[in-house]
Curated annotation (Swiss-Prot):
Known role: Cytochrome P450 monooxygenase; part of the gene cluster that mediates the production of the antimicrobial trichothecene harzianum A (HA) that plays a role in Botrytis cinerea antagonistic activity and plant defense priming. The biosynthesis of harzianum A begins with the cyclization of farnesyl diphosphate to trichodiene and is catalyzed by the trichodiene synthase TRI5. Trichodiene undergoes a series of oxygenations catalyzed by the cytochrome P450 monooxygenase TRI4.
Glycosylated residue positions: N444
Protein name per Swiss-Prot or TrEMBL: Cytochrome P450 monooxygenase TRI4
GO molecular function: heme binding; iron ion binding; monooxygenase activity; oxidoreductase activity, acting on paired donors, with incorporation or reduction of molecular oxygen
């Protein structure tokens, strides 16, 4: 029988020593198992990665999103398949992408390790289980179909008109314009119009610093910490906000944004119930009596709203900004695009339908090159084949193993995209003429059964926005170089390092509006 009194007599130093010894033994056993007994022991890769999450933690958390480039070095040394941590395999082979991100009947879960940092457990995008994800996506699909997006075109055009008025005001005032901020405000207004049924006038914010943009930037800074230590981030969230702002400001920004989403959602829900109008995703999908009650809770509304605003704001706005950088850096490309846009029938304020614009080959090439070189989310989003092993060449990947491939490697594959770091709209025109389906290699929105639900809306925003800005204004880059877009940190999406002398830590694209055209 255990003698409690005897335990009390153990000297503290002895107790600490015993605890350290037990911890060391556990660590040694875990490392031994992962290296020599684990089902992935035959997959190539560095032993330091195989023993646990330690190498990844160092490069992602302590070095701020650097593991992507370490994985690139692993592939250079070990080949196209590597074990990037104790439990996950990464494949750098574009031809294998659709095997990982499949659209077939194979049950494919999301890796739980990739969703915890977002703290949106009931959102469709964070749903781990294959069947539950399919059901939740089915509730939302009608609101993001091509037909639904076509119905949103007047709203997008109205917001672009507001954006152009901000451009013109900066021209009159001879002020420098933040393209990052302007495009973030535009895309945030569009997605809030879709989600809530009305936009939130973020384009009216004088400096374009609004709560959604600041909230996403806050999330990007804590994303990797949240993946590895979700309890630490959760504990910080429980503190008073004034204290959080002192200890860790990014979490305060994130909490402020979620509070606004919740308040806006409840307000819209209340108005819609009294009017009977179902004009938004929130009201239409999440109050549908055909949807199970547990799927129509306030908590789920908040989770879905958070993801919609993040995904619908930052990725599209960064793509627009990077596309504009390349256009303004390459006058020949810019002039070719202007000439093509002149071929469109005359219209008020250069407003044309998405259908008209998608028939323009050079604009289509510009949009796809912008998508390719902005990458979208580049952090690994692993998939898990739950019931069957996958085969990659001579390597068998056991069922239940998280497997990933980053968009970064697909979009810079020299066999698919020669001169991958060059902005070449012509490559898309030539591919179309040669019957090459190059578009299938654009993976910003992922592919398969978990492809981003908002991809049609993002395309619409890009086509419509570029088609109206380019003919309307002569813009000039201001104190902005390629260092402002070169990706050096993988935090959900890719960000450049902070440029000395700039105020923004996540990149800053600035222009002068020279004249109206």
């Amino acid at each position: 029988m255990l003698d409690i009194n005897a335990l009390k007599e153990i000297p503290p130093a002895t107790a600490v020593g015993a605890a350290v010894a037990v911890g060391a033994l556990y660590f040694f056993c875990q490392c031994f198992y992962n290296l020599y007994l684990h089902p992935l022991r035959k997959i190539p890769g560095p032993k330091l990665a195989a023993i646990g999450p330690y190498l990844e933690f160092y490069h992602e958390v302590l070095r701020d999103g650097q593991y992507l480039w370490e994985i690139e070095k692993m592939h250079q040394k070990y080949g196209p398949i590597v074990r990037v941590n104790a439990r996950e395999v990464h494949v750098k082979d574009t031809s294998y992408y659709n095997t990982i991100y499949t659209a077939g009947a194979r049950k494919t879960n999301k890796d739980p390790a990739t969703v915890g940092a977002f703290d949106v457990p009931t959102a469709t995008a964070a749903t781990v289980d294959h069947d539950l994800h399919r059901a939740r996506r089915g509730y939302l699909n009608p609101y993001f179909s091509k037909r639904a997006v076509a119905g949103l075109e007047p709203t997008i055009h109205e917001r672009i008109t507001k954006l152009l008025s901000r451009f013109d005001q900066h021209r009159k005032d001879d002020q420098v314009l933040s393209l990052d901020g302007a495009f973030s405000a535009l895309t945030a207004d569009v997605i809030t119009a879709r989600f809530y049924g009305e936009h939130k006038d973020y384009l009216d914010v004088p400096d374009f610093h609004f709560v959604v943009r600041d909230g996403f930037q806050g999330l990007s800074r804590v994303y990797h910490l949240g993946r590895f230590l979700p309890s630490v981030v959760g504990a910080l969230k429980g503190l008073p906000k004034f204290l959080i702002r002192i200890i860790f400001p990014p979490i305060a920004e994130l909490l402020t944004m979620r509070e606004e989403i919740e308040a806006g959602g409840i307000d819209e829900f209340t108005k819609s119930k009294s009017s009977g109008i179902k004009s938004s995703v929130l009201v239409g999908a999440l109050s549908d009596p055909h949807i199970p009650p547990q799927e129509r809770t306030v908590a789920r509304m908040l989770d879905e709203g958070t993801v919609f605003l993040f995904a619908g704001t930052e990725t599209t706005s960064r793509t627009l900004g990077i596309t504009m950088f390349y256009l303004l850096s390459n006058p020949d490309i810019l002039n070719k695009l202007r000439e093509e846009l002149k071929s469109l029938p005359p219209s008020d304020d250069n407003m044309h339908s998405l259908g008209q614009l998608e028939n323009l080959p050079y604009l289509t090439g510009v949009v796809h090159e912008g998508l390719r070189l902005s990458f979208g989310p580049i952090s690994r989003s692993s998939r898990v084949a739950t019931h069957e092993a996958l085969q990659y060449k001579e390597h068998t990947i056991p069922a239940g193993t998280p497997v990933s491939q980053s968009t970064y490697f697909v979009h810079t594959d020299t066999e698919i995209f020669p001169d991958p770091w060059e902005f070449k709209p012509e490559r898309w025109i030539k591919a179309a003429e040669d019957g090459v389906a190059l578009k299938k290699y654009i993976t910003n929105f992922s592919q398969g059964s978990r492809q981003c639900i908002g991809y049609s809306m993002s395309f619409a925003e890009m086509f419509l926005t570029l088609s109206r800005i380019i003919p309307a204004f002569d813009l000039e880059l201001y104190d902005t170089t390629k260092a402002d877009i070169d990706m050096t940190h993988a935090r959900i999406v890719g960000y450049p390092k902070k440029v000395p002398g700039k105020t923004e830590s996540l990149g800053e694209l600035r222009v002068k509006v020279i004249k109206k055209l």
